[in-house]
Amino acid sequence: MNVDHEVQLLIQEIKRLGSPNADGQIVVKFGVLFSDDKCANLFEALVGTLRAAKRKKFIKYDGELLLQGVHDSVDVVLLKEE
């Protein structure tokens, strides 16, 4: 899979698992993404896909690297879909 395709799949999963915040942006907790069975099967390297999506300004989250357990409560915010 190429990175752009994985980023698009990630966007779909954020929309599926997340909910709108006060600004109307879709938000999901990192722990929810990480523990979801479908995401686990889709993404061999979820953290790498998240970093690629952040670099391309599709999403935002606090920090540079998200780790399971430590960062489960960090919000992943969808900024754009295309």
List each language-model region with its residue ranges.
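Eukaryotic low-complexity, proline/serine- and acidic-rich intrinsically disordered regions
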Residues: 4-7, 59-64, 75
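Charge-enriched amphipathic alpha-helical scaffolds
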Residues: 30, 34-66
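Positively charged, polyanion-binding regions of nucleic-acid-associated proteins
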Residues: 2-25, 30, 48
